[in-house]
Amino acid sequence: MLWFSGVGALAERYCRRSPGITCCVLLLLNCSGVPMSLASSFLTGSVAKCENEGEVLQIPFITDNPCIMCVCLNKEVTCKREKCPVLSRDCALAIKQRGACCEQCKGCTYEGNTYNSSFKWQSPAEPCVLRQCQEGVVTESGVRCVVHCKNPLEHLGMCCPTCPGCVFEGVQYQEGEEFQPEGSKCTKCSCTGGRTQCVREVCPILSCPQHLSHIPPGQCCPKCLGQRKVFDLPFGSCLFRSDVYDNGSSFLYDNCTACTCRDSTVVCKRKCSHPGGCDQGQEGCCEECLLRVPPEDIKVCKFGNKIFQDGEMWSSINCTICACVKGRTECRNKQCIPISSCPQGKILNRKGCCPICTEKPGVCTVFGDPHYNTFDGRTFNFQGTCQYVLTKDCSSPASPFQVLVKNDARRTRSFSWTKSVELVLGESRVSLQQHLTVRWNGSRIALPCRAPHFHIDLDGYLLKVTTKAGLEISWDGDSFVEVMAAPHLKGKLCGLCGNYNGHKRDDLIGGDGNFKFDVDDFAESWRVESNEFCNRPQRKPVPELCQGTVKVKLRAHRECQKLKSWEFQTCHSTVDYATFYRSCVTDMCECPVHKNCYCESFLAYTRACQREGIKVHWEPQQNCAATQCKHGAVYDTCGPGCIKTCDNWNEIGPCNKPCVAGCHCPANLVLHKGRCIKPVLCPQR
């Protein structure tokens, strides 16, 4: 019997052409449990036997595929497909040789040994010569020393001389301590035996073209951008930059470096790669390869308030890359790889100089009656009227942060609304309240507010809190909440927003760690224990989408119908509006007279479209923004901290309280019973 495991059409073709053999194929199933490929027919025949246990067999049409290998196992032919590993993101050159199944990150072959990319080594016979492999290129160079004193001392068995003392740039370093001089990412120094020794990092030669390289922030050496793939290179030949060199051919990389293609590896040697002085004929290379560099010969560049060493590169403003060349600063525009779209699960980030694809952050949205959409995309409704954990870090016993929401019935029979949002960061408690009012540890504050671990500011019609922990909270001052979690928090969160692990099926894990089959049980398990009485009479069930009168139903559908209008049409093909429409109708049917309850669904749909890079033409400022204060008040991010009322408007004296954000009465009006009125209209005392 001939067994196949997931080899698809090749197995089917071979079995159909071999009527005398029984093929037992292990079928692959799709997500619905339906067999793929060979599910359409049953193949019959006799058993394929073999004699030599463990022998690798060649079977036409099957083993022609380099990923499939057939062996004799228990006297029967068994075939298996090789599974290819995922290449590292740092792999800049992937190769696939003829006859091989999987792609590999290009390594190096040198003197009969094989080395992985980024590996560095030194030979005992040549301890002062450094060799390093980088995507098929071996760079051979001498250890580069940096000397900062006039009379350095050379030591037997050491590549670099040392300078007396361990005081460097005015700082006293301890024995064994390693440090970097200010402004030099490429130089490392150490304090050994009461003396200082400094070594400058030698950067590997890259196989990619120069315009496809960049220096990552905070690093010394450039790296290749993206990943190149090469198939079926001629045996022994080398790919370097955009050219292919035959085995044994040589070329000059620059005036000081000669390269040779040896057995598919480019070996590049610096001309002054050994300790000692330079010959007269190599004066042009001495600046690059001298092991001893006296201080007076070191040419540096000053750019802004920083000092850069000769040969050092850095990113400047306006997306330019600069280099220090023999004491002169040279800058050029940064070359970017054109990117127009990203694979599923990633977004195009245009914040830097070059667009890059980054993992999408997790987004949890709460809006309306309220409707919850978790980080992993599960939607549910819950009308509790207490305070609940929206999300927190569950990866450690003492959660470094948590976001709480407090719900309010707002005089409805069956529904509740989000009344306020509270962010707890260590000892700090930030409360986002109605009409975009903000309290920090109980005191109202003005905007913007910048603290060590968070920043609060008004972003258009939304209040935005950005934390160093990786959370970003948006609040509209009414009942819309959006929590954005950075990708590094994946799998660490819990609460009403779910666990952010990429699977919506396990989002209903309660506060006790057990999965809940009922949404209400799940939500109540995240209730914050307090002495406050927050229960209300038993909620009336809502069997229908809308239980109001005909007039109420007509108003609900009339307002929510705008989701289908031209203002949102550009997004319909990308983000389905049906869920938001149902939520809108539900909210409108239990909507208090003074509220525009469609706003939350419209805002949630608009934000979902914006996250997909689609601009819609709806703006909430006219009817929905919380900055549109009522009863004569106006919104101000830094309004007076002392409220003028009918009881105190004529009192003389300055206000010593700091300004606060929120709705305030204009200077010529006073607050009375929630309304701004003229002082002459105040009731007599």
UniProtKB/Swiss-Prot annotation:
Domain TIL: 629-682
Glycosylated position list: 116, 247, 255, 318, 441
Disulfide bonds: 364-497, 386-534
A GO biological-process term: endothelial cell activation
Cited InterPro entries: Kielin_Chordin-BMP_Reg (IPR052424), Ser_inhib-like_sf (IPR036084), TIL_dom (IPR002919), VWF/SSPO/ZAN-like_Cys-rich_dom (IPR014853), VWF_dom (IPR001007), VWF_type-D (IPR001846)
SMART domains: C8, VWC, VWD
Pfam families cross-referenced by the UniProt entry: C8 (PF08742), TIL (PF01826), VWC (PF00093), VWD (PF00094)
Distribution of this protein across tissues and organs: Highly expressed in lung, and brain and also in primary chondrocytes.
Signal peptide: 1-39
Domain VWFC: 50-105, 108-163, 164-225, 238-289, 299-358
Gene Ontology CC entries for this record: extracellular matrix; extracellular space
Subunit and partners: Interacts with BMP4.
Disease named in the record: Diaphanospondylodysostosis: A rare, recessively inherited, perinatal lethal skeletal disorder. The primary skeletal characteristics of the phenotype include a small chest, abnormal vertebral segmentation, and posterior rib gaps containing incompletely differentiated mesenchymal tissue. Consistent craniofacial features include ocular hypertelorism, epicanthal folds, a depressed nasal bridge with a short nose, and low-set ears. The most commonly described extraskeletal finding is nephroblastomatosis with cystic kidneys, but other visceral findings have been described in some cases.
Protein's name according to its UniProt entry: BMP-binding endothelial regulator protein
Organism (species): Homo sapiens
Gene name for this UniProt entry: BMPER
